[in-house]
Amino acid sequence: MTQKKENRITARLREDRKLLLAYYMPEFPVAGSTLPVLEALQDGGADIIELGIPFSDPVGDGPVIQNAAHIAIRNGVSVRSLLELVRKARAGEGCRKITVPILLMGYSNPLIAYGGDCFLHDAVKAGVDGLLIPDLPPEESADFLQRAKSLGLTVVYLISPVTPPERIEWIDSLSTDFSYCLAVNATTGTAKLADASTEASVDRYLERVRLHARKKFVVGFGIRDRARVEHMWRLADGAVVGTALLEHIAGAPNPGEAARRAGEFWRGLR
């Protein structure tokens, strides 16, 4: 019997070091940007890349990611075309082969429209490593997410500052490899972590998560620069940067310039 290949996210987390995760919306800011940007992020040292699944009504996202999603849709991104981009990235078609773990993050509506089981099988076939679906709570999605796990996909759940200790422990037990902590209760990109009282509150919250979580956890929302990354590394196992990356590449006139800006920004975080 052929031994099942280890999930790339699982393997990455076994390296036992602090992680830097990139969030990128495909085909932003211009069509054709995805593969060059993925290559630039990989070369720049991204440990895991979260690819956004664009949706027309992303209620949990701030204006930067909402705008990026609308541009992605305008540039023809669908669930099917996104999976094809992942397949090309893994095969090295149009770029150097992308080996960094890839996590898809998006709302449930496009996945339901695609067909839940079909999506899971096609995602695995394309080379996706994991899923984070913010509007699909574990209480309402046990069967779907169990099927995802059975196919070897990492399933990531959210923890927020208002999550009680007993639920932190439960979410931690459900997450395959790690949980995703929202730094504050806000839409993406709108959080401000520089205020001393806010920073102290976030610190206490992450210390509480550390007390109740047995698995690793990363933190996102409002992380914009190297100083914030280093601060979060002291409290969590990884930091996620998304809105600031999208802001840095916004307005690039072509895929090459988008990739150059992405690489420049990401190297500055490292």
UniProtKB/Swiss-Prot annotation:
Pathway: Amino-acid biosynthesis; L-tryptophan biosynthesis; L-tryptophan from chorismate: step 5/5. Its EC number is 4.2.1.20. The active site is at residues 50, 61. Coiled coil: none annotated. The keyword Acyltransferase does not apply. GO terms for molecular function: tryptophan synthase activity. It comes from the Bacteria. One of its GO terms (cellular component) is cytosol. It catalyses: (1S,2R)-1-C-(indol-3-yl)glycerol 3-phosphate + L-serine = D-glyceraldehyde 3-phosphate + L-tryptophan + H2O. InterPro entries: Aldolase_TIM, RibuloseP-bd_barrel, Trp_synthase_alpha_AS, Trp_synthase_suA. It is an enzyme of class 4 (lyase). Keywords: Amino-acid biosynthesis, Aromatic amino acid biosynthesis, Lyase, Tryptophan biosynthesis. The alpha subunit is responsible for the aldol cleavage of indoleglycerol phosphate to indole and glyceraldehyde 3-phosphate. Tetramer of two alpha and two beta chains. NCBIfam families: trpA. HAMAP family: Trp_synth_alpha. Belongs to the TrpA family. This is Tryptophan synthase alpha chain.
